[in-house]
Each structure stands twice: as structure tokens, then as C-alpha cells.
Amino acid sequence: MKKLTIAWLSAGVSSFIAAYLIRDEIDEFYYIDIDDQHPDSMRFIKDCESALGRPIKILKSNYGSVENAILAQGCIRIAKTGFAPCTAYLKRRVRKEQFELLHQNDEITYVWGFDSTKHEQNRADRIVEAMPQYNHRFPLIEQGLTKQDAHAVLRRLNIRRPAMYDLGYQNNNCV
């Protein structure tokens, strides 16, 4: 059995900064590419790779896009909760099929980019409850950092944030 610490980058600032803060403790970095991400997301991932000085492995769902996942699975976005079931098919399923099955006998620690706000702390608690078979690290929460703090660290690293933020979005999710 191997012990692995894995960071899943979302192409968002918070997930990158969380990984960056404990980069020397992380064995592998991953990004799951989705066709519907803004084209600038890949530039950001490459900039993150340069800052980390380590490769970021890129995985991709066979569905490719949100539309394909919706058509194949008949899922829709639930506006009230903000939950997009397509995320389950484009990210979670990829993680399970392309990573977790290969490492099912290993001790895995996942690094997450949730910040220190109460809402994000609640999300972290739900992750721990939903995935008890893994260990979890939340560097932004551990260091009391907010999303704004993460953006400030990114500026100090002289990395341009993903274009979706400059278009007024709070996160760098699908377009």
C-alpha cells in the first residue's frame, strides 16, 4: 500500500492556491478538462504548472462537454441548490474511473480548495462525511484564508487569474 497526497485542480484560484501552499507535501497534481471550460482555463493550468515546478496530469471524461453528459444521462442543473449533476459525470466519475480504481489499495489524501468561510467549511465537512475512505486536507481552511486571500496570493505569484473571474463570475466553472 502506498500513501499518496493528491491535489485536484479545478482551474480556479482557490484550488490552485490550496495546492500551492502545501506543494511539497503533494505527490501528484490533476486537472479534469471539460470542453465547456473557458479556453483561458488551460493557460491558467499551464501557469500553475510553471509555478509549482511540477507536471499537472490532465484527465478528461469520455462525454467531453456538459451538453453530452446531459444528453447521455438525462441530467439537469438544479437551480435551487446550484448542484449540476453533470459535474458528477464530467469530474467525479472521471476521478473514480481513471484514478481511484487504480489506487483502491492505497491510502489517499485529497487536497481541496475550500476557503475559511462558514459555507465552505460546511462543504468541507460534507466531503469528509461523504468520502470517509480517504483523508482530506483543506489548506485554505487550515490557514484561515478566504477566497479574497487566495486571489491576493495569486497576484503575489504574478499569475494572471482565469478570464472567467474578469467576466464577473465568482468561480471558474463551465461557460
What kind of feature is each model-predicted range?
Residues 1-175:
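Nucleotide-activated chemistry modules centered on ATP-dependent adenylation/adenylyltransferase
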